């Protein structure tokens, strides 16, 4: 526990600017999004995990004057495989760290789009005192690494955050290999969502617009909590439409190195092409109207204009 509390202190102090900068440059987060993720949330994860671990150990069966009862927790018989996403540096650190904190050896496969901040996380853990061989980072082809890991007899658990279909594939492969493992693997996963905003007729129009625009376009909508659809009363729509256009057009787009930019590039070309195809489809669909935005350009970066359809 002391090691990870020290890691939290290192991130809060000497590594704060470095891990924020890595998250901004390599994951294209603006300064605000980087600070609340790579610094604040990661520090909270590490400190809260220690607190929760303490509570777990403190929760013991009752003893009597002539009988002492104690419940001990031990690590799994094997290693935990941590698979982490690009969109939150905090989650990328938390998944391997929480398993290691409970005494497990971890193989950590970061996203290929999060390598820079992953390296800094490992530097922090080493300086804090995590021994060599406890958290083992593996870079490479995700499918190849995962298939190799899941084929090992010593595989004892997976800690995953990512897309639903990938998690289903992993679960299926674990099931196919279940006869091969030493023990029954523990499976923990957090997957994507399709979040929405619902507005009541009594709601304040400006507040609804803020909820939609900020909810949809923070970090270019690249998180499971992003608002990707909205349901609003017809009576509210004329005023809300104008407010949405005003608010969306006020967002500056460009490099995260300019602290005035709210919108930055999407994570990679595959994401850019997917979003551009949706915009193109909307332009061709007679039943769809692009309220604001609708432009994209990858000549100097993977920039998608914030778009409401």
Question: What is each PLM-predicted segment?
Answer:
Residues 22-29, 61-66, 258-264:
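Short linear capping/connector segments at secondary-structure termini
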């Amino acid at each position: 526990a002391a090691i990870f509390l020290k890691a939290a202190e290192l991130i809060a102090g000497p590594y704060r600017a470095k891990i924020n900068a890595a998250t901004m440059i390599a994951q294209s987060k603006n300064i605000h999004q980087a600070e609340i993720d790579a610094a604040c949330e990661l520090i909270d994860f590490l400190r809260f995990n220690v607190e929760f671990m303490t509570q777990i150990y403190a929760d013991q069966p009752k003893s009597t004057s002539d009988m002492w009862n104690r419940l001990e927790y031990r690590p799994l018989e094997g290693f935990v495989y941590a698979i982490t996403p690009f969109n939150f540096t905090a989650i990328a650190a938390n998944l391997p760290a929480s398993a290691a904190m409970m005494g497990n050896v971890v193989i950590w496969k970061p996203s290929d789009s999060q390598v820079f901040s992953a390296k800094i996380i490992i530097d922090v853990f080493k300086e804090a005192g995590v021994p060599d061989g406890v958290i083992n980072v593996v870079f490479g082809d995700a499918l190849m690494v995962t298939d190799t890991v899941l084929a090992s007899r010593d595989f004892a658990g997976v800690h995953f955050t990512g897309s639903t279909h990938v998690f289903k594939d992993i679960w299926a492969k674990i099931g196919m290999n279940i006869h091969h493992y030493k023990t029954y693997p523990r499976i923990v996963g957090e997957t994507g969502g399709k979040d929405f905003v619902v507005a009541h007729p009594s709601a304040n129009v400006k507040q609804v617009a803020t909820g939609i625009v900020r909810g949809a376009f923070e970090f270019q909508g690249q998180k499971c909590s992003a608002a990707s659809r909205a349901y609003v009363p017809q009576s509210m729509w004329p005023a809300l439409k104008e407010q949405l256009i005003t608010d969306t057009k006020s967002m500056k787009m460009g490099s995260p190195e300019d602290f005035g930019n709210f919108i930055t590039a999407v994570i990679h070309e595959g994401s850019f092409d997917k979003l551009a195809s949706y915009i193109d489809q909307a332009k061709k669909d007679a039943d769809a109207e692009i309220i604001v935005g609708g432009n994209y350009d990858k000549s100097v970066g993977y920039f998608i204009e914030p778009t409401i359809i």
